[in-house]
């Protein structure tokens, strides 16, 4: 059976070259005589894997030495609690709510202190990003939290908050590695890997070292960033397979794509094809303010919900799967992460036009 074009928001497509390499190494990795899924995390082979994965991430993202990297189980949702447990030293933090996940992060933080929602785009169903330069931030906030790309509603920040003395914490789950990021603008960057990096089962956090070591004594051991980072993510058994796959994807980005600047050009070209088509007809509609349209997650609707269902069903039959929009939005969503080839976008647009002509 031929591979489909998978537009899932996550878990999502992985580069075919990476999958083939993982397939080739599945039974026997290097000279270990065993699979990565079987080997001890204390073995010399896995030690080399995790060390090289971190080193490659530092190169690809240009992460300075005074930032620490941790590989965590629990996904980005667990980070919603870890962030306030580790960083809310003043008892309060500022949250900008631009969608479902930033809202969930704020609700989780409110269990541990004062989570001030200083701005929200809920008034227009999260179809824009508030002006980060016009927000009344709290000077005594421990940090400012954002979700930099909103998977469900299809928006992205065009600039990020910068408040002197208040670190910025960003959930980058659905846009990480899609373009270069100035890491020094952030106190902490975290992301689940299942959207743009690797199979589900892990989150990665990149943390400025001056923010570490401030968690209260009663914070559970495995919810303390310092626990894992001081042990090089090996305090307990790490998600070995995810780390291995992350390493393969990073090397693919570095060696085959040529880095994140090239990846950004490819991604923006892919998104332009789809958005240009959406803007050139009146059967489908994208509700997002143009300036804030996500490069990774493109949302659209047809004339009515029944037509949306018909579209998704016929698209799946044609080899375009997981286009159904999130239940909070409806319609359709094409998640076009790094691994989605340009031909997948071109063929999707061709299908959309044929469907439009048949149903207009």
Locations of the language-model features?
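PLP-dependent enzyme catalytic core of the Aspartate aminotransferase-like
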Residues: 2-4, 317, 326, 330-360
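A glycine-/small-polar-enriched, mobile loop at the entrance of the PLP active site in fold-type I
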Residues: 3-54
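Active-site phosphate-binding strand-loop segment of PLP-dependent enzymes
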Residues: 10, 109, 120-176
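Conserved N-terminal alpha-helix of the aminotransferase class I/II PLP-enzyme fold
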Residues: 32-79, 86, 100, 108
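PLP-dependent aminotransferase-like
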Residues: 77-144
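Active-site C-terminal subdomain of aminotransferase-like
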Residues: 188, 193-275, 289, 358-360
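Conserved PLP-binding catalytic core of the aspartate aminotransferase-like
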Residues: 284-314
